[in-house]
């Protein structure tokens, strides 16, 4: 659990997301409240529930990115789902309880990785012994083993091919599900049973693999680390992490709104909302790893609400999403900042990609302004897809260079207004063309 202050959280989010200060402040406070709750006594801690958030704003303005970056900062189990992927209980499809099951699986992976890091030193020593055994043989004298150990640590044996026996983690039936009783087995989905999990339980299989010494280390360290981990402890920690600090991001919540004058198929969407109610309010969900209480999981719902309005959500669901945050549409100036100020700016990405072909790319201020202007213009005249438009525009600008870069090794390319005009000019002048190409 992160102990960052709200100001530090917002500052961290500013590195990747431009603007949207209201949304950043709301999620920063929600995350800090997690830490505050942990400082309380046991009697009061269970009474403090998270204040769930509803983000309202057009596509491509940073709703999903804010939540994703927040989860990384919090070092918390996180899952992003689309509300439209789920169906009402009783219908064919995934029910909303699958969200929590997937969150538990994500937590298992996260906790296992963290625990592997803790035992990495021991696992490294054990892996080294296994490599020496493969090189020198099981019955080798200590003197011989020491000689191999010195060569191994000096990197002299990195290209030597050895044969190793490692745990077989493959799961050929992993995605194979068969119908079962409603409610599923061990908390699978409704009426679904995962054959892969059943056979995985039998486990213990090993496979022989031929690898170079250098390539074998990562595999062996992972194998040895897993031997040092206690599966029961991993599961227990994962369930606790989900219950106490899990974050669920539900996108496209506006797509399951039934408009007030709707009839027929639209009305069935309310079923998904009704199923979400107990999940967000607090219920116990059965999973294959054990029961999970959802009382203290933070839910962040988001939607563009172009057609439906937040008031079209079920009143009970509105009440369970008490914090409303409006995200504004992005402007040309925002696009300039996105291309220059963020740590993961597209300009830096393209410069680095071209550098692998020994082509030096430099963006001028005028070039960046031209890219931002075109993106804003097309958003206005065609369809506003926010910052995602920048991907389309830059990909189009670099289309020719990306193709010819291997033949231009050693060249220097300046992306200025002329370069942008040369690669995009015709398209931007023709609305019909930009409608289909950009």
Curated annotation (Swiss-Prot):
InterPro entries membership: AAA+_ATPase (IPR003593), ATP-dep_Clp_protease_ClpX (IPR050052), ATPase_AAA_core (IPR003959), Clp_ATPase_C (IPR019489), HslU (IPR004491), P-loop_NTPase (IPR027417)
Please provide, in alphabetical order, the Gene Ontology terms of the cellular component aspect for this entry: HslUV protease complex
Q: Which UniProt keywords apply?
A: ATP-binding, Chaperone, Cytoplasm, Nucleotide-binding, Stress response
GO-annotated molecular function: ATP binding; ATP hydrolysis activity; peptidase activity; proteasome-activating activity
Q: Does the keyword Nucleotide-binding apply?
A: yes
Q: Where in the cell is it found?
A: Cytoplasm
Instruction: Enumerate the residues binding ATP.
Output: 18, 60-65, 251, 316, 388
Annotated GO biological process:
protein unfolding; proteolysis involved in protein catabolic process
Entry coiled-coil feature ranges? none
Q: Return the Gene3D superfamilies for the record.
A: 1.10.8.60, DNA helicase RuvA subunit, C-terminal domain (1.10.8.10), P-loop containing nucleotide triphosphate hydrolases (3.40.50.300)
- Its main subcellular localisation, reduced to a broad class, is cytoplasm
- The source's superkingdom equals Bacteria
The UniProt entry, under Pfam families, shows: AAA (PF00004), AAA_2 (PF07724)
Family, as annotated: Belongs to the ClpX chaperone family. HslU subfamily.
Sum up the protein's function in the record's words. ATPase subunit of a proteasome-like degradation complex; this subunit has chaperone activity. The binding of ATP and its subsequent hydrolysis by HslU are essential for unfolding of protein substrates subsequently hydrolyzed by HslV. HslU recognizes the N-terminal part of its protein substrates and unfolds these before they are guided to HslV for hydrolysis.
Q: How does it assemble?
A: A double ring-shaped homohexamer of HslV is capped on each side by a ring-shaped HslU homohexamer. The assembly of the HslU/HslV complex is dependent on binding of ATP.
Q: What is this protein called?
A: ATP-dependent protease ATPase subunit HslU
* Source species: Jannaschia sp. (strain CCS1)
Encoding gene per record: hslU
């Amino acid at each position: 659990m992160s102990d960052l202050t709200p100001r530090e959280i917002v500052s961290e989010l500013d590195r990747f997301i431009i603007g949207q200060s209201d949304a950043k402040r709301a999620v920063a406070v929600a995350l800090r409240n997690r830490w505050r709750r942990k400082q309380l006594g046991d009697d009061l801690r269970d009474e403090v529930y998270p204040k769930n958030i509803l983000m309202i704003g057009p596509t491509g303005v940073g709703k999903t990115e804010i939540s994703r970056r927040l989860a990384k900062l919090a070092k918390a189990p996180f899952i992003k789902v689309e509300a439209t992927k789920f169906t009402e209980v009783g219908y064919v499809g995934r029910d909303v309880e699958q969200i929590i099951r997937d969150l538990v699986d994500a937590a298992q992976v996260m906790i296992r990785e963290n625990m592997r890091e803790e035992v990495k030193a021991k696992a490294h020593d054990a892996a080294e012994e296994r490599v020496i055994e493969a090189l020198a043989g099981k019955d080798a004298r200590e003197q011989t083993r020491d000689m191999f150990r010195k060569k191994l640590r000096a990197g002299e044996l990195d290209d030597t091919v050895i044969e190793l026996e490692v745990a077989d983690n493959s799961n050929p039936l992993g995605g194979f599900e068969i119908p079962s009783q409603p409610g599923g087995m061990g908390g699978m989905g409704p009426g679904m049973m995962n054959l892969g999990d059943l056979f995985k339980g039998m486990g213990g299989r090993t496979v022989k693999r031929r690898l170079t010494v250098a390539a074998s280390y990562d595999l062996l360290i992972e194998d040895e680390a897993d031997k040092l981990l206690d599966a029961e402890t991993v599961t227990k920690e994962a369930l606790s992490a989900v219950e106490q600090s899990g974050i669920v991001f539900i996108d496209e919540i506006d797509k399951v709104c039934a408009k007030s004058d709707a009839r027929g198929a639209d009305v069935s969407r309310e079923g998904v909302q009704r199923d979400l109610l107990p999940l967000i309010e607090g219920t116990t969900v059965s999973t294959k790893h054990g029961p999970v209480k959802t009382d203290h999981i933070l839910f962040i719902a988001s939607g563009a609400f172009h057609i439906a309005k937040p008031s079209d959500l079920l009143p009970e669901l509105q009440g369970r999403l008490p914090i409303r945050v409006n995200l504004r549409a992005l402007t040309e100036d925002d696009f300039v900042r996105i291309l220059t100020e963020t740590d993961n700016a597209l300009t830096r990405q393209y410069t680095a990609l071209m550098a692998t072909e020994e082509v030096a790319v430099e963006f001028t201020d005028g070039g960046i302004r031209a890219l931002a202007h075109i993106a804003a213009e097309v958003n206005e005249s065609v369809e506003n897809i926010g910052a995602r438009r920048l991907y389309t525009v830059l990909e189009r600008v670099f289309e020719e260079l990306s193709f010819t870069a291997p033949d231009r090794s050693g060249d220097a390319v300046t992306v200025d207004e002329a370069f942008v005009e040369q690669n995009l000019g015709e398209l931007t002048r023709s609305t019909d063309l930009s409608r289909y190409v950009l």
